[in-house]
């Protein structure tokens, strides 16, 4: 039909990560995507200096910021570091267990771990919670309190993973006809 059923689309531009080096280059990139119509920026990683500059410049321009903290970059900027630097929201949950570490900076993965294997990556990512502070512990409480004080938003993504576990039920969901893109409907 060509109709948009949602109230509106809020376009976010994807930050190119380590291709942008330095404070001024990051700010210049944010200004450029704002000029092209982006209302926000999504990040997957980059240098600490560039990430902080993106958060700051986006805020100055009234843009939103969201980050999928790539697992191979959270050792130097985890979700709490990003929240303190001005990030608005954390996508999925990557970077949160690392913010809850008390005895390490880098995640412990088995020596044979293959980051390129998505199912293995998801399994190991889930095990990161076993390396984090115990729920309810002092460190856990401090991290959660600080994130709340910073008005930091956590945006978990569970629906499609549930569909992977129960495709038959998800295939017949009543909202598909109205909301699922035709290309994605082929998955179901």
Where is each model-derived feature located?
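Alpha-helix-loop-beta-strand connector modules within alpha/beta enzyme cores
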Residues: 2-7, 11-12, 52-70
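Hydrophobic faces of well-ordered beta-strands that scaffold small-molecule active sites
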Residues: 9-13, 41-43, 65-67, 90-92, ...
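Active-site beta-loop-alpha junctions enriched in small/polar residues
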Residues: 14-17, 46, 70-74, 93-96, ...
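Short, acidic/polar
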Residues: 19-32, 73-81
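Aromatic/hydrophobic pocket-lining residues that form the small-molecule binding cavity
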Residues: 26, 51, 140
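Active-site neighborhoods of metal-dependent hydrolases
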Residues: 29-41, 96-188
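Generic structural signal for hydrophobic
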Residues: 32-33, 54, 58, 82-83, ...
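Glycine-enriched alpha-helix->loop->beta-strand junction motifs that scaffold or abut catalytic
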Residues: 37, 60-64, 84-90, 150-151
